[in-house]
Amino acid sequence: MAEFKHVFVCVQDRPPGHPQGSCAQRGSREVFQAFMEKIQTDPQLFMTTVITPTGCMNACMMGPVVVVYPDGVWYGQVKPEDVDEIVEKHLKGGEPVERLVISKGKPPGMF
């Protein structure tokens, strides 16, 4: 059986023109929906993976942000078309998608 994964997708929204912007304004709701569709149609992943929408994870300028636990891999600027690659390479294959990784093991820009 595959290792359990918990995927967090920031869907934080802010008012238009806010200087920090938000993941939602950069398309994170579509990213979340793409993960849900992919996971719910794959029997193996459906039993081993949870997808959770979250509020701000303080990496707004790199959004949409996705974090995979227990691996602690942070992805940035994720687009809906990146979801298949993250699912196949990381969730199923155990290898992060390096071109999208912004941090491993801790929130980006901290410590």
Swiss-Prot record:
Membrane-spanning residues: none
Protein name, as recorded: Ferredoxin, 2Fe-2S
Note describing how the cofactor binds: Binds 1 [2Fe-2S] cluster.
Residues binding [2Fe-2S] cluster: C10, C23, C56, C60
InterPro entries: Thioredoxin-like_sf
Reported function: Ferredoxins are iron-sulfur proteins that transfer electrons in a wide variety of metabolic reactions.
Molecular-function annotations in GO: 2 iron, 2 sulfur cluster binding; metal ion binding
Pfam family, one: 2Fe-2S_thioredx
Complexes and interactors: Homodimer in solution.
Cofactor annotation: [2Fe-2S] cluster
Residue ranges of coiled coil: none
Keyword list, A-Z: 2Fe-2S, Electron transport, Iron, Iron-sulfur, Metal-binding, Transport
Similarity-based family: Belongs to the 2Fe2S Shethna-type ferredoxin family.
